[in-house]
């Protein structure tokens, strides 16, 4: 999709969001976990189940981190599956860096707790639970790759968009665990 966007919008900055390392995890360890449990590794079910459009049947194909631990999957295996998912994305980004003109920046929308204890005397945290602020969640990489070519950007006046009801925005933020 990134290359298609570059073709369609050659004079625009592109923001390309990879779903990994969000679930489903990809890579050999994730495949072995799926063989062992019948499900892939996933995120935190309680936050997601608050969404109005939550699809329990679809979500049941994924283990929450807690489910994976209870099924005998070690913290280290979960961390390995997570790292392999990131490695798979990095492979894809390497070719994009070469193919897309101009500077490329790699960053993340958030970090992930992988069974660590960010709060003294607290329990282990998994995923990105709502209401938790920690370095593991908030400190993300920012890596810049310069290019010999500079992308020529074209500014255009903003297009009129229909306004969104503030209550709809608030509801969506609550559904995503931000409120």
Question: How would you label these PLM feature ranges?
Answer:
Residues 1-179:
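Catalytic domains that recognize anionic headgroups
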